[in-house]
Structure formats: structure tokens, C-alpha cells
Amino acid sequence: MNSEDYRYLPACGADYVTVFQETYDLKKYETLHLLGHKRVWPYRFEAQERALRGGMRGVGFSALLGLSDYHKDALATALHVYYLQRKYPQAEFSLSCPRLRPIINNEKINPLDVSEKVLCQILCAYRIFLPYVGITVSSRENARFRNGIAKICATKISAGVSTGIGDHEEKYTGRDTGKTGDEQFEISDTRSIRSMYGDMEREGRQPALNDYLYV
């Protein structure tokens, strides 16, 4: 989408966009995206800035750790945020740190090893380097890890997640659309919103389903 396209979204109720860069390794990126606009790496890289120019309240960033050298991808993600945070100080910024999971029906893509210890180090480094950004921890991680990292540096935790193509449409419309597909990746933390809410409260935290209001 171009900046002009993003200008329509706030009127429709959307004011935040997250773009998964996937990897900042240009050679690896080209092997994964063979066709379409997404193949043009600079256009993908500038997506968050186009969204901000189009009037979006905030933007999110992420590399898919394990696609390429996670050291370089983690550093590049942080520098990407750092650059735009100083260029657009009024905007809200957030980071997500998903690890590549085994892909159903696809044996060709195997995640490079990113252990829980490594992931924790990356998340803590993000918090130190970018103290004011939101940090989201994916449901790709198990409940034990997510509960622990929420005590250290994470600010956003998803719940009630479905990765099946078309699952949300059927859930909220109550209709069998016939459009559902395989799950895009395996989920480790399957807790519902109610269950997650209760677990956070028991640990002395105050869960918030919305962290901003327009006045």
C-alpha cells in the first residue's frame, strides 16, 4: 500500500499497522519472494514509513527469527525502529519477535536454531536499546516462557489465536465459508483470552485489552 491508500484506513477504524519484514538478508529475501510487489525489498522496507505518512497512529516491526542469521536480523530490526522513532517521535512503535516454527506440509523450510535463551537475550536487548517501544511475544512460544518474559520486558501478549486461513471469518460470522485452509504455523500457547486474563491477574498484573483512547 502507498501513503494515499493508508489515509483511508483511519476512517474505517484502523490506525495501527504491523509489517513483518521477515528477514533483512536481501539474498535470502529474494529466494522466498519470487513474484509480486512483496518481492521488491526496498518497497517492503519502507512500508512502515508510508503508513506513518498516511496518518496511521503507530507501526509494528518484526523479523522472523530463524530464516537467516538471527544476530543480523535482530540488530537490523532494532535499527529500523530506532531510525523511524527519531524521525516520527509522535508515533507509537512496537516490536514482535516470532521464531520460525515448523511449517505444516512443507519440509523445505527448516528453522535455524533460535533457542529460548537466545530469544530472551534478544528481547532484553530490545528493551534496553528501545525503552519506550511495545514488545509483543507470539503464541508460537509456550505459556511458561510467555509468563516469564512478561515479568521482564514484554508488554503485549496475544491470546485466543488461530492461524488457520479463514478461521476468524467462520468464527465471527458463524458461517461455513468453505475457505479455511491449513494452519500457517503451530501454536504453542493455546490459552483463551479469558484464561490468559486470569493467569495475568493471579501474577499480580493488570491486563488491558485496549491501551489507548481517542478523546
Locate predicted features.
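Conserved strand-turn element in the central/C-terminal portion of the radical SAM core barrel
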Residues: M1, L34-G36, A47-D73, S96-L112, ...
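Core AdoMet radical
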Residues: M1-L52, R57-F61, P89-S96
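Aromatic/hydrophobic pocket-lining residues that form the small-molecule binding cavity
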Residues: N2, W41-R44, A74-T77, L119, ...
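Catalytic cores of alpha/beta
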Residues: N2-A11, R57, L67-Y82, N142-I152
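Short, hinge-like loop/turn segments at secondary-structure boundaries
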Residues: A14, L35-H37, A78, C153-A154, ...
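Conserved, mostly hydrophobic/aromatic
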Residues: V19, A51, V81, Y126, ...
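Generic structural signal for helix capping and beta-alpha/helix-loop junctions
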Residues: L26, S68, G166-D167
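Auxiliary Fe-S-binding modules of radical SAM enzymes
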Residues: L75, R86-V215
